Structures are given as structure tokens and as C-alpha cells.
Amino acid sequence: MMRISIEGLKYLNSFSLLARPVKGGEPVKIQGWGMGSSGYWSTYYDEVEKGELVAFSLPAGEYEIYSFVATASAWGGPRTVSPEKNFSFPFRVQAGETAYLGNLLVRFRGDSGVASARVGTVWIDGQRKIAFEPIVRDTRSRDFKEMESRFPELKPDLVKVRLLK
């Protein structure tokens, strides 16, 4: 379980993370949020963080979150945006256990941040490059409260906290 958040992009229809087994295997898309989500990104530009608490299940093993996919309908037509280069946030899945991985916030910094991008850049419209930085935060105080209403079958006192690194 984790919160997937984004800040600094507008006109998004959906945002997902991509994970894969460290020792090879098929990638898995972790749907962060879409147009029907409570965290749907509005068509108005603001710097407010938007996101969604998500629960997902994977077989036991070592994984990494390595990329993201954003879809939008306002960058001159339907577009899909992904980073130019992958990043890596490893995590472990243990059989029979529910783990909280934290809040992965992908912060976009616009054209002006490209030269100083600490992690990566994406192309918008095939012409304009903007910077992003993924940041892991521990927001369990907020997330565990939300978990009780969104995922009542999960009990906070039984969830192992294993933040992404």
C-alpha cells in the first residue's frame, strides 16, 4: 500500500507508477489515480499536490519502482508522458504481509528546472522538456486514517511500515 502523488502538472487524466521484479520479469502498472478518482488532477493549474492512496498485491519478492506514465488530453491532443531515464526505488514484498511503502510524490518543476533536475526530465508535446523529482515521504498519519475508510479489511496495527528508499 502507498500513496501516489503528483505536483506541478496540469490537464492530467491519469497517473501510474511502473514496478518490476529486480531479478527480471514483467513490469506491473500501479494505477495511482484517474479521472474518476478523488485525487483527479483538475484542469486548473496550481501547485497543490494531488494523489491517491492505493492498495495492490504482488507475489513475494524484490521489486523496484522505476518509472511512471502520465496521460493527458490537453497537450495538443491525447498524450502519454514517461521519463527519459528510469529511476529506482526498491522494495520487498513478503508473503502474507501488508506493507506501507510511504508516499511517492513526483514533483514537476517546469521548463526552468531542467538544468538543475536532480532526477530526470520528460518531454511534453515532443518539443518542451520539463524537470521532475520523485520524493519519498512518510505520510502514514494521514494515510492510515484514510486506509480505515477506503480499505476497511486492512488493519493499521497489522501493517508493516517499509518506506521506499
Regions found by a protein language model. Give the residues of each.
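Tryptophan-paired
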Residues: 26-57
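A short tyrosine-centered beta-strand micro-motif
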Residues: 58-66
